[in-house]
Amino acid sequence: MLRDAIKQLPTFAARTYKGGAVMREFLGEQNARDNFYPEDWISSFVTAKNKVYVENEGITRVEYNGQIRLITDVVSVEDFGQGRLNSSVLIKLLDSAQRLGIQVHPTTEFARDVFNSSFGKTECWYILGKRSEDASVYLGFKEHVTRQLWAELFQKQDIEGMLSCLHKITVTPGDVILVTGGTPHAIGEGCFMVEIQEPSDYTMRVEKVTVDGEVLTPKQIHYGAGEDKLLDCFDYTPRTLDEVRSEFVLTPTRGQNGQLHLVKYSDTECFALSLVDGCDFGEICPSFVTVIVLEDGGEMLCNSKEYPLKRGEKYFVPANIEYKLKDAKALLCYPGVKGIKK
């Protein structure tokens, strides 16, 4: 079992869209450029599902006893917390220089029945920044959309037609957007965010060619499940824009210890997310906690060890270990509670 926090190192994963320059600057890289590694996977025990398999791609690298190790080699089940057999969460920094393809992630039930997976992929976006004033996301079907219409647009590969079926929401730093499994969505160009999600990498895509012109394989589109199952994955509930905002855009609430609760377990059982901004905060959490430092300054105390904090640093704090944040601005990411043994 771990007795101290461990520092996580940048762990970039290949994706089908270009980005990452803003993210890399946030992480301290000089002269950063966009490429096809636009995500940094944090507290990740999940291997990336890509066109070409790369061993351990996506598994977070950490500093441990002066060495660079995989988090899977350092963290034990006991470090997750009582009743936990796995991490129950995956966290990413994500920076889009291009619009991501229109997509959907499976619900828990769909993932179990179709992919034999214990986890679907409900996720949440916390917007850190944007490259332009009109940076946006697409979310939820408009009122006129039916499965038949969606299937016709998919077969025609009418991309503009499919985009017009989704609500477009301009984002602002500090926005918190919950995307439940089955909800159609696409992250637009110029969004920099923390994405917290269930620990899987299942993405069903309806665009067969990426924005950059790459032709996707059937495996990349639906993992061999077939186009009918791909269409089954979508929730065809029609919504007005006001309904989308009410259901998916969360309103943070202030906690007793000064932290801002961005995502609560009453919002979803899949994860929780809080923001500490300058207040002194401490806890002994029954689960592990992931700390993402948003600004230089302040410190973390963990089991009497001091950690001066810099922007872009990420820490894994094991379960049942006291930690304190002083004069820091940081996100606190918590794993899900669904199915946890008492």
Give the ranges of each region predicted by the language model.
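Ligand-binding loop in jelly-roll beta-barrel domains
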Residues: L94-R99, T107, K130-E133, T183-Y202, ...
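His/acidic/aromatic-lined binding-pocket segments of jelly-roll/cupin-type domains
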Residues: I91, L100, S117, E123-Y126, ...
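Short acidic-glycine-tyrosine-enriched beta hairpin
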Residues: L166-L178, L301-N320
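Transition-metal
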Residues: M1-T146, V209-T253, L273, K338-G339
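A surface-exposed beta-alpha-beta supersecondary segment
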Residues: C270-D277
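Non-heme Fe(II)/2-oxoglutarate
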Residues: E189-F192, E198-Q220, T253, G312
